[in-house]
Amino acid sequence: DMARAKNIRVAARGSGAGSLICHLLGISGVDPMQHGLLMERFCSPLRRALPDIDIDVESARRLEIYDLVFKRYGDTDWQSPQAISRCATVSMVDTYRARNAIRDVGAAMGLPAIEIDLIAKSLPHIRARNIEATLKSLPELRSLNLSAPLTAMAISLAQRLDGLPRHLAMHPCAVVLSDGGLLDRAPVQLNASGYPMVEFDKDGVEEIGLLKLDILGVRMQSTIAHAVHEIKRVEEIDLDIDAVPLDDEPTYNLIQSTHTLGIFQVESPGQRELVGKLAPKTFTDLIIDISLFRPGPVKSDMIRPFLNARHGWNPAQIIHPDLYSILAETEGVVVFHEQVISIIATMTGISLAAADEKRRALGSKEGQQEVCDWFFPAATARGYELKIITEIWDVLRAFASFGFCKAHAAAFALPTYQSAYLKTHHPAAFIAGVLTHDPGMYPKRLMIDEARQLGVGLAPLDINYSGEQYTVERDEKGGDHVRIALTSVSGISDKEVTSIITGRPYIDLSDFYR
């Protein structure tokens, strides 16, 4: 609510999307009852680990969320023994990699800074243990005498620092909340960003019983917010993107066409191939698509039997009628954690919460054996034949390597659909958002080509019209084009951009120069 009061987009991700309360409070836009999500996957009385809620926010405004949280739960005098500050960021141990290892060792040994800096800058972002092998393959360093005794010693020592702690750093997204003053529970220091930070990592704060909130900056959320703003400014349409219908046929037609550059989660070459073959027609199809395109299902060849059954080339293989309602939507293929939980509960009669504990145990070899020893007698007692139990067990055991949380996929599918909706119905505003916030995997030149294919023109850089961001302009004929931003100029600073905008309008070059 604090974020939305500031017009900052927020959305839940992860298993928290399976909570009906999260949905009713507006934290998650996905209805867990409509999509068969299970609360037990997120939180249950039997769960040993503390649940956490991951919140996606606009990447461009993530620190504003931090400020809101600390303003509400923090204390400006947090260093005082009487402080009631109940929140802080979480630390993580920054370990040595190649560049900082060679720099720190070189400085400690008193080697020439210019020489050490040249070596460090020449190294790619690699493990410190690979420094020597990498340096041998860099021709630009042949002029340096890397075999000199002190230099060779520095390289050898730097390699030995691989993976060792360098210093404490702020975790990129974790904030910890407490029901009392944090100084009574953990050591706290001020981090480089000016926020209080507990000196425990993410695992340590959970071990002492503190609740962790992950605030993740997502560029697609900033892209969507930018597009919605441009739609309102140019088209005078107050679009509530969170309320658009999830059954818009033109949107699914665009996804099926595989022209998905810029669309969240489905723009990679592999995903474009999959959406073309799967041909999503519903929101559930998007959830399945996102879940299937994971390393596990791809390596386990789970996609082919699903597609064959989906398109009627082969019948769906559902091992037992009791499992039909669980596996029908995925054509008999086990894709989701929630399906495993339901299968175990159905065949053994235990609660969903207990079934989730069994699912978690499948992640280790020891746990698999323990579950196996329990599962066969429990399912036999419920009247299932040994052949059926064995087939189901083989599926459950294999699932440990390729399962995915349906609630997580559903939370991802929502911005996937929303970004596809914007690209379908408001392409200029969508392209302006993508070019401004760069949420995807492709360079801007490809997105500019995509804009042209969508019929969206590109207006050149203009000191009188270009702003800090890419914006939509409408011509006299009603056509939309995107104006290139001043920030696209290489090397330009924020101060220079502000100065240019403040000094408008400019009559000519000499006026601009003055």
Model-predicted regions and their roles:
Residues 1-514:
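Noncatalytic, beta-rich nucleic-acid-contacting surfaces in large DNA/RNA-processing enzymes
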